[in-house]
Curated annotation (Swiss-Prot):
GO terms for cellular component: ribonucleoprotein complex; ribosome. One of the primary rRNA binding proteins, this protein initially binds near the 5'-end of the 23S rRNA. It is important during the early stages of 50S assembly. It makes multiple contacts with different domains of the 23S rRNA in the assembled 50S subunit and ribosome. This is Large ribosomal subunit protein uL4. The keyword RNA-binding applies. Pfam families: Ribosomal_L4.
Length: 200
């Protein structure tokens, strides 16, 4: 596959990594699994057995005219336990390497097809200045973008940190969710070559 950088230089990349047919079901499964794995899963509530108190029967079974009650910690009482209490849970789903690789290939290929992938020889800023990076993004017509480089430059990272809807990641930090979350993906040629090597 032959792609061009912003300056017009030709870059030859493999069809396997950047030209695969889009498989929506695969991408959906991998993205869902990734988001599920990010859940903390630490929420916890108490059942009627776990709430403190409630050992004494509030009133006798018969003769009061009131509805019978055996505990003040029944789920229908204020201060009672939850009927179906949530417990800590591991939400992570298993995704094998072949599926993950396939989803990344599909996403990268779709970015190319939708003209959302911008290849650059390199993207750097002379100082950690937000203003300088904003002007560079404006030149590339990419105000909301993920910037992917093979090695994250500290100046670039600091300059992007204060811009909403802009993020800087190294190739080893990129995940399926971040690739689809941004309007544009600005990628250095070196980063594209690394993806090609990893996904081919």
């Amino acid at each position: 596959m032959n792609l061009k950088t912003v300056t017009g230089a030709a870059v030859e990349l493999s069809d396997t990594a950047f030209g695969r047919e889009f498989n929506e079901a695969l991408v959906h499964q991998v993205v869902t699994a990734y988001l599920a794995g990010a859940r903390q899963g630490t929420r916890a509530q108490k059942t009627r057995a776990e709430v403190s108190g409630g050992g004494k029967k509030p009133w006798r079974q018969k003769g009061t005219g009131r509805a019978r009650a055996g505990s003040t910690r029944s789920p229908i009482w204020v201060g009672g336990g939850r009927a179906f209490a949530a417990k800590p849970q591991d939400w992570s789903q298993k995704v094998n390497r072949k599926m993950y690789r396939g989803a990344m290939q599909c996403i990268l290929a779709e970015l190319v097809r939708q003209d959302r992938l911008i290849l650059v020889d390199s993207i750097t800023v002379s100082a950690p200045k937000t203003k300088e990076l904003i002007s560079k993004l404006a030149e590339l017509n990419a105000p909301r973008a993920l910037i992917v480089t093979n090695e994250v430059d500290e100046n670039l990272y600091l300059a992007a940190r204060n811009i909403p809807h802009v993020n800087v990641l190294g190739t080893n930090e990129v995940d399926p969710v971040s690739l689809i979350a941004f309007d544009k993906v600005i990628m250095s040629v070196d980063a594209a070559k690394q993806f090609e090597e990893a996904l081919a």
